[in-house]
Amino acid sequence: MSVARIVFPPLSHVGWGALDQLVPEVKRLGAKHILVITDPMLVKIGLVDQVTSPLRQEGYSVHVYTDVVPEPPLETGEKAVAFARDGKFDLVIGVGGGSALDLAKLAAVLAVHDGSVADYLNLTGTRTLEKKGLPKILIPTTSGTGSEVTNISVLSLETTKDVVTHDYLLADVAIVDPQLTVSVPPRVTAATGIDALTHAVEAYVSVNASPTSDGLAVAAIRLISRSLRKAVANGSDKQARIDMANGSYLAGLAFFNAGVAGVHALAYPLGGQFHIAHGESNAVLLPYVMGYIRQSCTKRMADIFNALGGNSSFLSEVEASYRCVEELERFVADVGIPKTLGGFGIPESALESLTKDAVQQKRLLARSPLPLLEADIRAIYEAAFAGTIVEPHKA
């Protein structure tokens, strides 16, 4: 593209101990009555206390809202927005994975708007956001979604997903502290980590890629490739957690500015129809989508192979692109995620409905370097079911 639109959140604190910046930022924003939106499990294990205790010690009024579930349905979004509207809050803090952060963004913005959440959905909504809403601070506790730096809130519908998206959803402050991720269990570490990798990979091959997003994406891939396996094997590995937090943050910035594409388009129906975690949906499809589009972006796939730790010095560009797909397959397997749709209990009979839903994700599909039509999408799902990489001429 000739002119790139580059957007970053106003302010981020990134690094071990970054949570120490929370109280100063709350003071700077002039808040008094704070709504914290978080996962109930994070309250149970005491992690949310690390956020709320310093605030209460400073005399702030803090209400903790925990009606948060993974892959939140539209109804959950409506409830969070209604709660934010009814309260007299002047700041929203999101603490958790992508679901909690997405709900926090949604509640903060729609708290000052009329109508339902459904009115503002990307695919079917009829209204547009007109006001910034309440200030928001986003604090991720996983290294994967990148929600703390994007302007999107994802909601599950009956069989697929839709989004509310506008720059008003951007955080006023993002606080990325790797020490908050140390307690994340291996499977979640793996799923969110591959989610971050997918963000970087898809941003790098996106038709909207720019030199800025390219630099962010490659740096993210390097960090994730060297540290995700370590973080899965040993959650207390401080350097691995630091690398993953930074990698996820950079990947989030990359895909926010370049966009994600086919992997996410095909992953959304897996979550909508079978309630598979978003990161795992991306992970199982990543090698198959990238293998299918490989011929349309061989140079970039070769670059990704090198960023993953490969060495293409003695390989042709085409050979390196093949090796990239193989490495992505190996990476997903190494962190323990099933390599086929059947591994998640998805029957072959579901491929038709998955295809019909994925075709509707035009916003995502438009960014693919290879236009993916209905037949292409069906071929990729069939490949992911069979566990065999296919390309268009072989499909």
Curated annotation (Swiss-Prot):
GO molecular function: alcohol dehydrogenase (NAD+) activity; glycerol dehydrogenase (NAD+) activity; long-chain-alcohol dehydrogenase activity; metal ion binding
Assembly and interaction partners: Homooctamer.
PANTHER family noted in UniProt: ALCOHOL DEHYDROGENASE (PTHR11496), ALCOHOL DEHYDROGENASE 4 (PTHR11496:SF102)
pH dependence text: Optimum pH is 8.0.
Alphabetic keyword roster: NAD, Oxidoreductase
Descriptive protein name: Long-chain-alcohol dehydrogenase 1
Lineage, broadest ranks: Bacteria, Bacillati, Bacillota, Bacilli, Bacillales
A Pfam family assignment: ADH_Fe_C
Assigned EC number: 1.1.1.192, 1.1.1.6
